[in-house]
Amino acid sequence: MKENGVPLDYFSWHSYANIPNTMKFAAYAREQLDKYGFTDAETTCNEWNPEVSLRGTGRHAALTTGMMLAMQNSPLDSAMFYDARYGTSIYGSLFNPLTAEPFPAYYGFLAFNELYKRGTQAEVVCDVQNVYALAAYNGTDGYLVIANTGADAVPLKIEVNGNVIGCQLLDGEHLLEACEQPDAIPANSVLVLRIQIEA
């Protein structure tokens, strides 16, 4: 294609795999596009949804949130969750088709939106397997989202330039409900921290 001057605006692909494999796919797509001279072509995962069979559970919420957190620092240009429809579909993972109430994964999108609204990504160091974290800030208003996609609780050690002024938990029973900051992040859960950053 490149030899014949055929343009490639974007390359799209799907993934219903776990987070580590989806990140490998994203890296491979970018690597191959660059290798063959399509460095300006966008790469998009235009369908993703981890473990669809778990929809409506705290585990699915943790996996969905963890995927978004991981994708933020991947070579992807865009990604589309499949899907958010309200109705009968095995892929419809944000709303219960029987009650119209949001499934837990919906609240992971709300948490990610709070990161987006802050506007500036902050550095986060997280080297624990199956745990994903992302932070953002706007002036002195900081927000940290941590997803534990593993089967065990993980001790929590947070060092921030400021003070934690709020904590919320997302799991199978708590839908971003206020909580005390725990000593460990429960298995299959998402923890959200609001931070007052020191000037």
Regions found by a protein language model. Give the residues of each.
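Short beta-strand segments
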Residues: S12, T44, M80, V145-N148
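Noncatalytic carbohydrate-binding groove/subsite architecture in carbohydrate-active enzymes
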Residues: M1-T64, S74
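Flexible, active-site-proximal loop/turn residues at the rims of small-molecule/cofactor binding pockets
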Residues: A17, R85, I197
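Flexible loop/turn segments at secondary-structure boundaries
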Residues: I19-N21, P50-L54, G87-Y91, D152-V154, ...
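C-terminal beta-strand-rich structural cap/linker in extracellular carbohydrate-active enzymes
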Residues: E177-A199
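Carbohydrate-binding surface patches
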Residues: D127-G162, N188
